[in-house]
């Protein structure tokens, strides 16, 4: 469309605010429609219909989630979505932009205050000045690297702030046996889960307060903060009585461990910080003054306070000072295009599921109910494979790394999926996701696109 109507592109925005368009344009024009249709699973007519909608929309927000990120080329997929927004100037103006969907109340907020495996993203010099110590500057571990470290014995201790790590990770079948060999496994949690049972002798389960429970410390009732998906930071006060008088807050547990494990430091006041969380927020404001000045005063303003986003003001934090177009090496987000008889596995969550926790067995979003031990497949694909709806089948990984991965006892269920794709529920299907399949940039596990075969299950 842009070939025939130059007004579809925001030429002024592209010239002033972007770089790399020429390279990306050359890559796009090197593609053929047959390749695009085969890779996407969509006909040209459908793609052009969607393109017309986008081209005529005055304001567009690109919303994405794990369907884009959890691929071998997931980061490049997000880059392609940003490319689409850049072409019509849909960044940095009202009613437009890009919005990742995040479920947990602080999955973004913890990054904002420097929790990262990448030392270059943490203000280490500031922390050294504040607290009179030399912080470690070694690169930490991603999820993939932690699991690999468990398998090869490099990881000796594990401390989890909530979550169900052992069920959320890929390659559970390989990882499950090694948990019992850890010298130390500390789980700080609000409810029991499977990870708490895969332990050895040096294991501690420390229950803590949930955010909705009253948190009384020596300084009185305490509040915490969360950051939402749109970068607004809100205060939160628990209103329910704690489940037990003996419960400690996460902050109290972490500070208690640190106080017992580390030598005294006159610049570090663990007990005071536990007694008054406002003092911790003051330290955050001192560490990030451009974001958190007046933190305690602003946290309860209606709607929360806006953290800010340079892109909103068309300020690009890149080496070129401009927004860069992404030119991928491959059209497909997959590691390899599946061969004959091989399907790409999509791990799914039901609408009554939050992360690894399943609250019910009615997946109303997909019109499914009951057993979660199912595999979804297009009716035409079922027929082509010589299978039948309702048949018991198994999924068998075809990833060639020397390990056997199989999930059986699944009911074959017809569903409107693209040809060559099958769907199964997360985390049950994580046993089929190889540890070696992950995004090449972020190392996010490839919970989408793992290669599998659907075979009859005689058992």
Model-derived features: where do they sit?
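Long, low-complexity segments enriched in small/aliphatic residues
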Residues: 272-364
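Non-catalytic alpha/beta scaffold blocks inside enzyme catalytic domains
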Residues: 1-94, 101-284, 344, 348-459
